Amino acid sequence: MKLLQDLPKNPRYSILLEPVWAIPGTIVLFYAPLYMKDAGLSDIEIGLINSVNLYFAFIFQLFAGSITNKLGRKRTTLIFDLVAWSIPMFIWAFSQNFWLFLIAYLLNATSKFVTVSFNCLIIEDVEEHKRSKVFAILNMIITGAGVLTPIAGVVIADFGIGPTLASIYFIGGILMTAMFFIRNRYTDETEVGKELMGMHSQTRVMHSLASSLRLFGRSFYKRRLFPIILITVLSNLILQLNFFQVIFFKEQLKFDDRVISFIPVVTAVTVMLLYLVIIPRLKRRSEEKYVGFSIILSTAGAVLFLLIPVGNIAMLFLTLIVLAAGNFILQTYRDSLLMNRLGTHEKADMFSAVQTVMTLTAIPSGYLTGLLYHYNPMLLFSVILVLYLLLMIIMLFLPDPQKHSQVIESYKNM
């Protein structure tokens, strides 16, 4: 594909294989709250599972950078993809009670290792100005997989959400497992990864963890980095708080399963039009400018969300378009901006530290989300709007870059 010709081997093969994960993954993640409700779990139980998942994700995240440096990006990605996705997919396929869901989500929490290792694997050998392209294509594939959710919606309408989702979980588990081994076969350890594996081969994990936390502490004094970290952390918190969105559409706004199944389609079409048609025609600007614009767009979408009348499909789709555009631009340029501002040899440790703070702030969100939704669903989404307004304030402190310099000193100068 011409689109991928200018990319190195790792991101090229990762992008080509990503649909194998994205198609079943997008469907099951979208319907997961309804699947748990169908199994008899209450709002509070669902929120509790989410919080426990985030708590253990926080624990695993503490060690993600050091483990990635010790085992290598490639090996870490394979091991924890199997633990975090292959095994839980098969457990979810047969989950009919709180405890099975809890076990599956506990295993899935190890995906925090993959968040660090996979991002390093696909980015470290890529030229800096091409990294936003890699993130954009991956985000587009994951979102674009949503065009298949209406098919799942039709099957759900005929056979019920339980049997349909159980089948998708099981088949998805088989496909994902095969994909993980194939991707491992066709990717290589990055040059930085090889160097760090040598440096950390005799280093204890706890010592490496302490070094990464010291590096993260320094970031609070870096004006070019600190606002980016805050935006990354808060935007992730918003994502966690949106967990009950699909339940809200069904229970409060009274949309049926067929309408709900088209929600990912609207999002996917919006993202593809943005990436393939609109963004290429925009004047090239800094990543900071795109992040600021995306926050404004997302805030507008959060306002529209609170104004959707019961059963109004047109207003629903308009809101989804605005939110999809804002979130796609935000995730693409936020992640690229963060990775580009981290030092060459510190990406794994620093990215892991940022992810740790993200997870720490999100830990209470699962249970809190369940409580807020149970008390007043509109209150939950009002809190999300407040967080977007806070992001608008933070974006005013994003520096307009003159040079794309690294902001963290190397290990050699520690």
Residue ranges and their predicted role:
Residues 2-58, 224-264:
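Helix-loop boundary and gating motifs at the non-cytosolic
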Residues 75-90, 289-304:
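Structural signature of the two symmetry-related core transmembrane helices
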Residues 106-142:
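Cytoplasmic helix-loop-helix junction between adjacent transmembrane helices
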Residues 113-126, 328-342:
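Intracellular juxtamembrane helix-capping segments at the cytosolic ends
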Residues 173-196, 392-399:
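C-terminal membrane-cytosol helix-exit motif in multi-pass small-molecule transporters
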